[in-house]
A protein has these predicted regions:
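Conserved "HGTGT" condensation-loop signature of ketosynthase/thiolase-family condensing enzymes
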Residues: 1-162, 167-172, 178-359
């Protein structure tokens, strides 16, 4: 195998190569960004008022026969369908790798049953083994969470230099609707505030960078998220939130940054109360040339709230139609007391290295 297992990877840096995502609005890829679709009335999911809720669901998923999985956990069966429906496009990302190059696979899928998780992994491994990609598969493992890519994809005991990260979730179900974690995020009745339940399957191809290695000459560098904890958003005035977000943007992406101005901003929950004013106002203050309407993408507008799949999906959305030398900022603002920020930083051009900023 051309890629030996290593254990000296930089825990704080990854190189993002490509990505693809299956969403209710359609397929998202590096050269395709579908138009947002309006949610549809669910035939089974009811709000607290007894009326049907609007949801973002993917139609035409792969037909699978897994009675044991259905018995163990209804949600696990839905996630299995999402994985299988997106798998062909996900595996095609591996064509970007040099020939005979080893890779790992990490599946992020929040299932409660360990036995169900084992079935998901076994089925995934079997499909890969039946393709020419199977010859170079290293480790394949399951992770419950997908919010932090650096933690999810870490390989302290060693791993292949490349990793295919598949992250799926669906919160259009009764259990997630009333869960404590999502009660203040998802809309709870027909006229309530919040995000519509949604689902997605995202796949991202990444390169694990070594601690001594230089920055990549292609692709985008993804460093660990900057995380700011703060008082609940509901207890603060708009100008206070806007000022705090502007300061966070300035700290995260200083004015003297050699990369210049990011070309795109992706936001996880633009539709939650106050987020549009908070993020939009701070962005204009920090970068007057950026319009959050034209240059921003709201995940919730495209496919509602997609749970643990949101981070991987935001990475794919940031890449969509992004040019090799452009950069993107990714904002996680759905939580009441926490804000997260990632940056996709493209290679620094020779002109920029020499001190000429043409941004």
């Amino acid at each position: 195998m051309a890629s030996p297992v290593r254990d000296d990877y930089d825990a704080d840096r990854l190189q993002l190569l490509d990505g693809v995502a299956l969403t209710p609005a359609g397929l998202v890829s590096s050269d395709s960004l579908p138009e947002a679709l309006t949610p549809a009335l669910s035939s089974s999911l009811l709000g607290a008022d007894g009326y049907g809720l609007l949801v973002h669901e993917i139609t035409g998923l792969a037909e699978v026969s897994e009675p044991e999985l259905a018995r163990l956990e209804t949600k696990a069966l839905r996630l299995h369908k999402l994985v299988q429906s997106a798998l062909v496009e996900a595996l095609m990302l591996l064509d970007r790798l040099p020939e005979e190059t080893g890779y790992d696979v990490v599946l992020s899928a929040p299932v409660a049953s360990g036995e169900a998780a084992g079935i998901l992994i076994d089925r995934l491994r079997a499909v890969i083994a039946d393709t020419h990609y199977g010859d170079w598969l290293g480790e394949i493992r399951h992770s419950q969470q997908g919010s932090d890519p650096h933690t999810t994809l870490a390989s302290p005991d060693g791993g292949m230099p490349y990793v295919l990260w598949i992250s799926v979730d669906s919160v259009a179900n009764d259990k997630d609707l009333v869960s404590p974690e999502l009660r203040n995020v998802l809309v709870q009745n027909a006229r309530g505030k919040g995000l519509y339940p949604g689902e997605a399957a995202a796949a991202v191809l990444l390169h694990r960078l070594t601690e001594e290695g230089a920055g990549p000459e292609h692709g985008w560098t993804l460093e660990r998220a900057m995380v700011h904890e703060h008082p609940p958003r509901a207890t603060r005035r708009d100008y206070e939130k806007r000022k705090a977000m502007s300061q966070m943007l300035g700290e995260f992406w200083p004015e003297d940054d050699t990369l210049g101005v990011p070309s795109r901003i992706v936001i996880d929950a633009f539709g939650l109360p106050g987020r549009a004013v908070e993020v939009g106002g701070a962005t204009i203050e920090r970068w007057p040339e950026i319009d959050t309407i034209d240059d921003g993408i709201g995940v919730d507008g495209l496919c509602g709230w997609v749970g643990e799949a949101v981070t991987a999906l935001m990475l794919v959305l940031a890449l969509a139609e992004l040019k090799p030398q452009e950069h993107a900022v990714i904002l996680g603002v759905h939580a009441e007391c926490c804000s997260r920020m990632w940056g996709l930083r493209g290679p620094v051009s020779e002109a920029t290295d020499a001190g000429e900023d043409h941004s």
